[in-house]
Amino acid sequence: MVILEKPYISNLTLEYLSNNNVPVLNNDFAKECAKLYPLNLITSSEMKEEYETKDKIYTTSENALEWVYENLSKNEIVKKINILKDKAKFRELLSPMYPDFYYKEITEEELGKIDFELLKTPVILKPSVGFLSVGVYKIYYKKDLEAAILDIKNNREENKKRFPKAVIDNSKFILEQYINGTEYAIDAYYNDKGKPVILNIFTHKFSSPTDVSDRVYYTSKDIIETFKDRFELFLTKTNEYLKLRNIPIHVEVRVDGDIICPIEFNPMRFAGLSSTDVAYYAYGIRTIEYFLQNKEPNFKEILNGKEDKLYSLILLDKPDKTIPCSRFNYDKLYDYFENILELRKIDNPSLDVFGFIFTETSKENIKELDYILSSDLYEFCNQ
C-alpha cells in the first residue's frame, strides 16, 4: 500500500503503481495523479484494514505522515516514527553505541541565550524534527550562531506554510557535534524479521567543508561493493535498539575510518522527492517495488558491467526562489554532461527547484560533477 502526497511524485513511480494495481490512498494528491495514470484508489478505512493484515505501507512524502499519525495512532509504527523523527530521542536511544556523542535539545528562546563559549564547536544546529537540509546550520564561530538564529527567525513563518509540523517542527532544535568523515545515504528497508535489506548506497558530494546543500549525490559499483556489508552490519546493530520491521528507511551516515556514525534515519520512505529513482537509472532497481514485494537485489549480478561509472542525482536548486522555471535553460544542461539519463523539469511554487537530472558519468570525467556542484546555476537562467 502507498500514500501519495505533495509536493512531487515521479512518473516512474506512478507508472509502477498503475501497472501493478497497487492500493493507493484516495486523497486529493492521488486523485490528481490518477488523471495521468489510472490508480487503484482506496478509502482511509480500506487502507487501515489493509495495514492491519499486511503490516506494510510506503509514503512518497513526509507530508503523508499526518495521515499515519491520525489513522494508525495506536499502532506500534507511530511510536517508531516518533522516535526516528525526533532527533534528540533518536540520539538517546542509540547512546549505548555512541556514549561520547555530544548533543543537546534546545528551544529557540534558549538558543538566543546560549553561552557560545560552552559549545564544543564545530556543531550542527537543526530542527529536532526536520526534512532534507531545511534549517541545517554548521556552527564554527559565534557569528555563525548569530546568523543561524537570525535565519531561523526570518524563515519561521514560511516553513510553517510549506511543511506540516510532522515534517518540520521549529519549536525545538538540536545542537550536536559535527560528525567527521564522508557522508553516505542508504535506501533500505527492514523486513518482517527485522533484517535490513539495502537497495542503494550513494555518497553526498559537497563543494566545501561548510556546504550543507543537497546538490549532488552519486552511486557506483565501487561504493556498493565497499560499503554494502559494512552498512548491513551497522543497520543490524542499530536495530537492536530501534526494533524496526516492515518499514522503509532513508538513512544518512558519515564514515570515518572504521567508525560509522548516523546522521538520521528517515522512516516510511526512501530518498525524498522521488530521488530514490537514481537506483532505477543506475541498477534497474525500483526501490518501492523491492520493498512492497520483499525483494532483495542480487548486486553481484546487477553490478556486472558497471565498472568505472558514476550514477548521479543532481538537484537543480534555485539560487533565488523568485526566479521562475520558465527562465531556466534546460537544454543547456546537455552541453555540460556526458550522459543525461533523465531530465525532470519541476515547476512547483512550493519547491525552490528547477528540477532534477540523473546522469551517468565516467570516473575520469568526475569534473562535470565538481562543476555543477560549484555553480550557482545563474548561467543557466535566461535574462
Residues covered by each model-derived region:
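Conserved N-proximal alpha/beta basic substrate-recognition cap immediately N-terminal to
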Residues: 29-119, 131, 361-374
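ATP-grasp fold ATP-binding core
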Residues: 94, 119-139, 158-181, 186
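Glycine-rich phosphate-binding loop of ATP-grasp-fold ATP-dependent ligases
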Residues: 123-153, 183-185, 207-223
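Peripheral (often C-terminal) accessory segments that flank ATP-dependent C-N-forming ligase machineries
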Residues: 292-383
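ATP-dependent carboxylate/phosphate-activation module, predominantly the ATP-grasp catalytic core
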Residues: 177-180, 187-243, 266-295
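Conserved metal-phosphate-binding beta-hairpin within the catalytic cores
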Residues: 239-276, 303-322
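Conserved ATP-binding module of the ATP-grasp superfamily
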Residues: 100, 142-180, 237, 241, ...
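Short, charged N-terminal beta->alpha structural module
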Residues: 1-37
